[in-house]
Amino acid sequence: MAMPDFTMRQLLEAGVHFGHHTRRWNPAMAPYLFGVRNQVHIIDLQQTVPMLDRALKVVRDTVANGGRVLFVGTKRAAADHVAEAAQRCGQYYVNHRWLGGMLTNWKTITGSIKRLRQIDEMLSGDTAGLTKKEVLDITRDREKLERSLGGIKEMGGLPDLLFVIDTNKEKLAIEEATKLGIPVIGVLDSNSNPAGVTYPIPGNDDAIRAITLYCDLVSGAVLDGISAELAASGQDIGAAEELPAETAVLEAAAAEGAEAPASAG
């Protein structure tokens, strides 16, 4: 599987170049802005193209070396796309609400994940000994935990890289990653704060088409990294009785085919 490809035209069609009204800008973003049109800042796509390309290579290389990528996007416009993209490539996501300490207090988060697993086992087994109210209360607990932790319950440890949509809204996630030395890829709109973002991608972080494009490209880069990891391991997949998890992810992605055109190589 080749690295995901993209063109300047795709970025333009997705509205990646549209920033916010000039009164909402962050002066720290000045180096990434091309100009102003109708009181709206225009992002310099001549910079976006190489910076997005670099970010995708970082994703691929991280995964090729066995690393984990955490997709973060909790605002309504991003939530579904973040979850779908992460699931498509076998990675992890937070799309409901960032809980304080999700990275810096991983031990406590691990305890909550363990509780979620216990509830899953309880509800999938015999609940005959429980009252209807008890089952309802446990189910509600599970739903609450699943919303917050469902995307990371299989992560098994801290991520090696964060991919963030809306660095202003996900400020806490970026601060925690910075404290732990975890690199961050972040989409930076004209009102964004670039502090703590290791690999910036200047671009609109509100338009659904733009968000979908970023997510599809990052997901494609992960899949390319998985392919590289499998190739480097020298596994004879055809001779194996059971397929590695990574291969299952690649097969599922291949089955989707043209459903994610932005991820196509």
Curated annotation (Swiss-Prot):
Asked whether the UniProt record includes Ribonucleoprotein among its keywords, one would answer yes
User: GO cellular component terms?
Assistant: cytosolic small ribosomal subunit
The record ties this protein, via Gene3D superfamilies, to: Glucose-6-phosphate isomerase like protein, domain 1, Helix hairpin bin
Q: Which GO molecular function annotations are given, in alphabetical order? A: structural constituent of ribosome
GO BP annotations of the record are: translation
The record's keywords, sorted A to Z, are:
Ribonucleoprotein, Ribosomal protein
Q: Name one Pfam family in it.
A: Ribosomal_S2
Similarity comment: Belongs to the universal ribosomal protein uS2 family.
Q: What is this protein called?
A: Small ribosomal subunit protein uS2
Q: Which organism is it from?
A: Gluconobacter oxydans (strain 621H) (Gluconobacter suboxydans)
